[in-house]
Amino acid sequence: MFKYESIYNNIKDRIQMADLQAGEKLPSIRDLSQQFTCSKSTILTALNKLEDQHLIYAIPKSGYYVVDHQMPHKPSTTDFIDFATSSPTWHAFPYKDFQHCMNKAIDTYQEELFHYGTPNGLPSLIDEARKLLETYQIFTHSDHIFVTSGVQQALAILSLMPFSNHRKTILVEQPSYHLYMDFIKTYKLPVIGIRRTVNGIDLEELEQIFCSHDIKFFYTMPRFHSPLGTSYRKKEKEAILSLAARYDVYIVEDDYLADFEQNTKVDPLFSYDTHNHVIYLKSFSKIMFPGLRIGFAVLPPLLTPLFQRYKKTTDIDSSMISQAALELYIKSGMFNHYRARVSGTYAARATILQHALRKHLSVYQFPSEICMHSHIVLPKRVNLNLLISHLNQHKVLLEPIDGNYLDGVLNERILKLNISNIEEYKIEEGIKKIAIALNNSKNYF
């Protein structure tokens, strides 16, 4: 056995025996070389192997720390099966790791905290963002990346600022992201809806809208649409981009669930764009936690200066502490490690949901995608409000779809499903209860 392997095993055993706690700093390389009577390069080899195994992580100019590997079970405080909540499971996040990054961020950026930042965001985070975005097949220059206070802020700025095509009307899928629907209604923005279903959108209708209306941009979720859970195929993406280029319409791509993609061959719309007509939005609210309030926006060159000006008048800069902590979290490799682990957890839940739908609700239409969001298309004779109320009384929580539509748009009979906050063993039980309720004539008109 080589010397570095002996050191690796020693430290690994101490971590597994909890002699070294999650978040605890390892002795310095110099101290370890003295402890094990070996060269610093031997210690570095052992530490690199521990890092490769995701047992420790490095923070520049600080040292090596033990990764928090705990994924505690959620306390069973309720008997409800919650298909309504879309926020991530709070107990799954390794708080100790991120808390350490927060503390380190305050130490590292003491002076910067007393100055206003830049409209684009913390430069060191933007550099990490550029490298991270490349793993999603988003290749761009750092000058076109903005750190925003969540995707919601990016959407607000894009909705209010003028575009180079000098148009005003926004096109949105129906149904769509409920908070953006609220924003459009509140500000009374000119808007048109296009129906999206399990089968996607009608491309002929899309062309007709692009051709006959002054469409500023088309807001879309090509991957794992909220609330439907559906995704566009490659041919649909290419067709949408072709029409956008022909009619000079920008595409706002909300890729909020990119981190949960299990198929490495699926790329975002942005990666197919050759005419600089796609604005890419990346969120951390699902993969980490909504309270972080950090998102990335990638702008085409023509829109970059104006977006920067509008963002500066909105908040000058997003939270410096959150930005600095996220930079360290990404740079240390902890984000990639956590992303791989938690996306696998949600994929397992989504697979159980898909199997349960096929087993108990096969007579209804639902998407085939393995996603934490899904839905069931119900017959028109189903009274959706009565059905939801009935299921709530039987401890199955569901949310009406009304908020995902614009005013005046005929709502589909769609039952939204989200498994973000349901334990695996409860998913099929919940679907069975829905199937039983649909067999009850009291839930029909």
Provide a role label for each language-model segment.
Residues 83, 251-252:
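Residue-level marker for buried hydrophobic side chains located in beta-strands
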